[in-house]
């Protein structure tokens, strides 16, 4: 008997800390699990957390005077390419899945940081201190940028195809809010029954807490497998269809109650069952020795009326 037969598994948060605004850490204990289940649970959650949790990122930027990423803007220390790389690293927190736009309009001398970005109310910057650029003198930096939500990593060329904003510069987007996931499986010898437990470590970029990420990951696992749970009745129906088809194929041609002439012609052609008969088209029946058009029509009509089977006129 496994531990799961006696009591359900529980998740405990055994450590949680903020290493920096963009680096949150959580360590969790999942127990008890039956022997062999630990690696299944740990590996499944790890893959879901790393690859299936949504995040937000800048995907394209429009900067007046910048025709491409290699442009140089007067009075700005960074090249356009360096600015794009800095924008790529900015972490956003949002619950909206809609495409959103943000703006920046600032005059030097100043140091431009993420806190200077003008954003919709539905989205916020996780770390306002993230560096973007340095402006000297009376230099201006104006931009309009697009924020998308997604999963994983999106190359800049995909942003071009998806958005097609004229004169926009595409940005490689890092949507993944989870930096890293580790897990370890241990056997628990302290309980009455031998069980396993999983120790799961999660690092996030600050847009989501490790605990919330784990909750979302578990829900996604449930949503993934739940539809499969309801497939049993459909499978049962299909299995009955196979059974019905098998029974039809085993029916003897005698069941068609044909005339003696038609019946004898079929028998001489070694057609004994409906399965044998279905290997023929309507044209093939006419080629059977002494099998005239009237006999063929008789067989075709009997198949349709008694078994709801229609012979094709010719072979495909």
From Swiss-Prot:
Residues 1-232 are annotated as: Alpha N-terminal domain (alpha-NTD). Residues 247-316 are annotated as: Alpha C-terminal domain (alpha-CTD). One of its GO terms (molecular function) is DNA binding. It holds the Pfam family RNA_pol_A_bac. GO terms for biological process: DNA-templated transcription. The N-terminal domain is essential for RNAP assembly and basal transcription, whereas the C-terminal domain is involved in interaction with transcriptional regulators and with upstream promoter elements. In plastids the minimal PEP RNA polymerase catalytic core is composed of four subunits: alpha, beta, beta', and beta''. When a (nuclear-encoded) sigma factor is associated with the core the holoenzyme is formed, which can initiate transcription. This is DNA-directed RNA polymerase subunit alpha.
